[in-house]
């Protein structure tokens, strides 16, 4: 098992990723974490932002009681903020937010208000930094992901098949489509690291067919 300690190369990884998000000297950067966040990633974020010359501050929340019967992390549905207005205001007033919460803010109820302030938010998945190092953002992914999102948004149906017998017809009419390439430099937006995916959320009842799972 790899140790969770500060490594120079991991500071480099965080700094390079934050630089892709447009973080420069003098920017106000908030590090949002909670009591069950991975400490090494919180420290790496702080050191990387300091290296870039950002003005860094921490917001540390108490991890809420579990509401799911299974381990949950990096879902994007964090409820750690708990509608605390001072926290939302502090994040919305920042230039950049490094999201180190356990689940991430991607689908959090407070995200729209945070983005309205113009903050750029990067959700750092709750993984060992060695995994983040192996999944560094690649600028070549951005145009490919954007092209994939465009195809999803223009498509009416998706067909999924496999040699095992899967044969699914999925209606994409009205589906929400999106994606991420591992960084964001546009104010009022969020992305997540690792990135490099396109996805759609079909409406209820829009999937028909057979899903075969090999034994």
Residues of each region from the PLM?
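Active-site bordering "gate/hinge" segments
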Residues: 1-215
């Amino acid at each position: 098992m790899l140790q969770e300690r500060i490594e120079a190369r991991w500071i480099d990884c965080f700094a390079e990723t934050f630089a892709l998000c447009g973080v420069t000297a003098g920017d106000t950067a908030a590090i949002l974490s909670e009591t069950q966040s991975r400490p090494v990633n919180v420290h790496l974020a702080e050191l990387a932002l300091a290296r870039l010359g950002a003005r860094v501050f921490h917001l540390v929340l108490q991890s809420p009681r579990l509401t799911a019967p299974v381990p949950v992390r990096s879902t994007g549905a964090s409820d750690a903020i708990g509608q605390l207005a001072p926290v939302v205001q502090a994040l919305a007033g920042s230039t950049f937010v490094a999201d180190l919460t356990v689940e991430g803010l991607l689908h959090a109820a407070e995200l729209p208000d945070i983005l309205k302030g113009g903050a750029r938010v990067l959700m750092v998945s709750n993984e060992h930094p060695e995994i983040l190092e192996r999944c560094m953002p690649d600028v070549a992914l951005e145009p490919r992901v954007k092209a994939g999102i465009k195809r999803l948004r223009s498509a009416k149906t998706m067909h999924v098949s496999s040699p095992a017998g899967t044969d699914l017809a999925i209606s994409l009419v009205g589906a929400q489509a999106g994606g991420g390439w591992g960084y964001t430099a546009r104010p009022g937006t969020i992305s997540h690291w690792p990135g490099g995916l396109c996805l759609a959320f079909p409406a209820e009842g829009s999937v028909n067919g057979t899903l075969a799972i090999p034994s």
